[in-house]
Design a protein with these regions (language model features):
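Short coil/turn linking the two alpha-helices of tandem helical-hairpin repeats
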Residues: 97-98, 104, 144, 165-174
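Conserved, well-structured interaction surfaces
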Residues: 2-4, 24-100, 114-127, 131-147
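Acidic, serine/threonine/proline-rich low-complexity intrinsically disordered regions
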Residues: 107-109, 157, 170-177
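Amphipathic alpha-helical protein-interaction segments enriched in hydrophobic
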Residues: 148-158, 162
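Membrane-proximal, proline-rich intrinsically disordered regions
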Residues: 1-15
Length: 177
């Protein structure tokens, strides 16, 4: 999932997008990207953000879809990769709904017939992703074995952020058990 490193953003999207608001700190030619509370899709940085997050979600969907029927027979390492893909997909969609609200939502590789679908309400996306993250956390270690790897804390932290963003303090988060 090199996509997060390949994007031309040196700073995480959540911080950059805050800078592009009327009250933000960004003073370059893109300073009006978020003026008025909207993101201009004609701006190259916004297009790169949208495309990059969907590339991450699509790659994760390919891994998840290809492995979902074989999870029970997988090695612990393979199950961890499967869970990491689910967390990365959730993070990509979290970034998208944080910036755009309702967005097209896919949980499997997209066919040509599904390419142009409507937007899914962000509440439905959040509900799906919270359940998915709780399931994924079962396959993740508490401490990552390598720098940059996903662990349980990442999954549970993302669940908490989505719960707050979605307006619910009562999300089902296995970390509270």
């Amino acid at each position: 999932f090199r996509s997060y490193f390949d994007m031309n953003w040196a700073v995480p999207a959540c911080i950059v997008l805050d800078h592009y608001t009327a009250y933000g700190l960004e003073q370059d030619e893109n300073s009006s990207i978020g003026a008025g509370g909207t993101l201009n899709p004609d701006n190259g940085k916004i297009q790169a953000f949208w495309t990059g997050e969907y590339q991450i979600a699509a790659r994760a969907n390919s891994v998840i879809y290809g492995a979902k029927d074989a999870v029970a027979g997988m090695s612990d390492a393979a199950r961890q990769y499967y869970a990491e893909a689910r967390v990365l997909r959730a993070y990509a969609y979290y970034n998208l709904i944080s910036a755009f609200g309702d967005v097209p939502f896919f949980t499997a590789p997209v066919t040509i017939d599904e390419y142009k679908v409507g937007r899914t309400p962000k509440g439905e996306i959040i509900d799906f992703l919270i359940k998915d993250l709780n399931d994924a956390a079962d396959y993740l270690p508490w401490t990552a074995t390598q720098r940059g790897r996903v662990d349980k804390a990442v999954a549970y932290g993302l669940i908490a952020r989505m719960g707050l963003f979605g307006g619910s303090f009562n999300v089902e988060n296995k970390a509270t058990e």
